């Protein structure tokens, strides 16, 4: 009897072990803020294909800002299409919008979304226009018997009330608070999904706020916008971001036991170690075979860093309209450096990809001081606050208190009360707060045209990399 009982117990234990949920693995591969940097796309393709060869359940996700930053993509016959064609070929599954998706206007974006073979989700864009169709707030993918929910959100903090960019690009669109919408759809989807993912283009600072406030329904947040490398756990939710410009791929491993998440891990993998996929390399090479963009327009006599490029652009907008002072916002300087030697048209269009025009204003030093202080203390677009944002041809010092709030701006070379002709980008003219001026207008002079003309006529250019602006704590 005792032997029979022991046998029954052994058999029962074996059956229980056999029936216990076995652990399976789901892999989320992620990119963000690629900014049209397709040079590395063949390496991305190799990395994705290697993962698909070894893992059964793989989902490929992008967190926005797919174009603006590479002339070979941005100035293609259909701007942005080379990037979309590559993403379609690689088999992306889901993506959300970034602020730069709107750079060519909402009608253009609406047409581009129709060309995307992957789901585009965004829970906080509401359209009242026929040019931009409503987007689904989320999608649920079924992979290997698992239901995986993806909610998308985009920043509305820099506008304010809409993503960073010219306000005209967002006419007829409203952008509800992305954190509120992320919470709303988390509550709706969590009971219906085995895994819940937020694909966020809010920036890691806003993602951290959301998770610290208790958005624990999400298993993973795939982030973007701030160009950071992020791998952290907040309240049980994994927050990730891969940097920018397709330098890395994010690999999130989700271990499933039955239909429950047993654990999540993240690795940031550099693409530099992968040999380019030859099929994708051929497609990318065709994009770069553009004689017009490849032609050297002039040359730099020395290497230029980001500050030097900003100095050049500030001087160029002033020269272009014969202004006494030029300002250029650092966010509009889209390259970090240009080496000494020949400078191609593609480099100039990569430096300034927006088709920016020059605006003219009459301002006193008091007006300029107000503009600089307001931007430094910006309570809305905090990502651009508490830094030197407006690079200028005239030196100045921002004086701050101990809490880093701007109190004053000193102009050692300007005369108080005098009215100066000032040149800025049309983006600053249309979007910056607290601009006080007279005789303001947007001219027909475009920034890239001025830069190209200077290269053609004045090469070799010596670029001044010395900062003219600084901050001093009082």
Question: Which residue ranges define each predicted feature?
Answer:
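C-terminal motif of bacterial Sec signal peptides marking the signal peptidase cleavage site
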Residues: 15-18
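N-terminal non-cleavable signal-anchor helices
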Residues: 9-12, 472
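Catalytic centers of hydrolytic enzymes
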Residues: 24, 31, 37, 169-171, ...
